A protein has these predicted regions:
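Extracytoplasmic soluble-region selector
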Residues: 1-82
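Low-complexity, Gly/Ser/Thr/Pro-rich intrinsically disordered linker/tail segments
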Residues: 300-331
């Protein structure tokens, strides 16, 4: 028998639960035993771990013959138990140390690897990490340009977009930027804006963050799905998010069907978002708009719902995923 976890480290918030995925080759009959070195810090039951208090504990899976695998589980106060909380404050400038920024990156990376890079579950994990587990809201920022220029954009990297792995929380990441226009500035720090819309005035500085497609492409890329640093759409002459997957018009009947899933795109012209959850009444839409990167709870059962006023289509991403599991779990 051979046992191995998908990760050797995993981060949790106090009160948060997660399922550790593993591979086991069993010869004949055998029973696998779970244990936690410190049950007061991390409890475990049939592969589901729960953060009980701050600290670390090794979680083990053994077969009784001496073969076992271990994961170091770290319960940290940097992460929040994932609940829908629209009262989060916006991320301030330089909120975290370099060491703390690395923890966020490692926490996200190990969650993705635990689910399997390129899978639907990995994308959902990524969406929920930034909108629920991360303790602040990322600000909306109109992009100053992108890596995919399409001859109409400035070439800019990390200005309202971030097509790189991890969170943009440390100035050590400036060295990874391919091009700058008005930056660089990490998320939450002031950056010169070029857009003239509402409170946004050209030449004024606002906290750097993500625009709508900046958030969606960041989430896809971090989950292991490389669609490129592209915009929302719809433009018949340019590759954009509306070209990814299989497009379906968002009607009441379609929204109430079983044809689409959590982890699919939901959008309207010029705006793109991701479905972060679904229950028997509501869709939970993860998006970046003027309120920041957050989850909007909207009814699909009510025919007069804002869902049908503000969104126009759903793009099924079945073909984009390496593993296309139907993700029914909420947070």
């Amino acid at each position: 028998k051979s046992i191995s976890f998908h990760v050797d480290k995993y981060y949790l918030a106090v009160g948060e639960k997660a399922k550790l995925n593993y591979s086991a080759i069993v010869v004949g009959e055998g029973h696998l035993n779970w244990s936690s070195e410190k049950e007061d810090i991390v409890s475990v039951s049939e592969g589901e771990i729960e953060g009980k208090s701050l600290g670390t504990s090794k979680v083990s899976l053994s077969d009784g013959t001496g073969k076992k695998a271990e994961v170091l589980v770290i319960v940290t106060d940097l992460l929040e138990k994932p609940v829908l909380n629209d009262k989060k404050k916006f991320l301030p400038c330089k909120a975290f140390t370099e060491e703390e920024a690395l923890v966020f990156d490692e926490a996200l990376e190990t969650r993705i690897k635990n689910k399997g890079e390129g899978s639907r579950a990995a994308l959902i994990e990524t969406i929920r990490f930034l909108t629920l587990s991360f303790p602040y809201k990322i600000s909306y920022f109109y992009e100053n340009g992108r890596l995919t220029q399409n001859n109409v954009r400035n070439k800019a990297d990390g200005e309202g977009r971030y097509y790189h792995k991890g969170l943009f929380l440390s100035e050590n990441k400036f060295k990874d930027l391919v091009a700058t226009h008005k930056g660089p500035a990490i998320w939450g720090c002031p950056l010169t804006n070029l857009e003239d819309h509402g409170k946004y005035k050209p030449g004024s500085k606002y906290p750097n963050g993500l625009d709508c497609s900046g958030f969606v492409t960041w989430a896809l890329y971090n989950a292991g799905i490389d669609v490129g640093d592209i915009g929302a759409g719809i433009d018949p002459n340019v590759k954009d998010m509306s070209d990814i997957g299989e497009m379906h018009t968002l009607t009441y009947d379609y929204a109430n069907s079983d044809d689409y899933h959590v982890g699919d795109l939901i959008a309207r012209w010029g705006h793109t978002a991701l479905i972060a959850g679904k229950d028997d009444q509501y869709l939970y839409i993860a998006e970046s708009l003027l309120k920041g990167v957050r989850i909007e709870k909207v009814s699909y059962k009510n025919k007069n719902s804002g869902l049908y006023k503000y969104y126009a289509y759903i793009n099924k991403l079945d073909e984009e995923y390496i593993a296309n599991d139907d993700y029914l779990e909420m947070w």
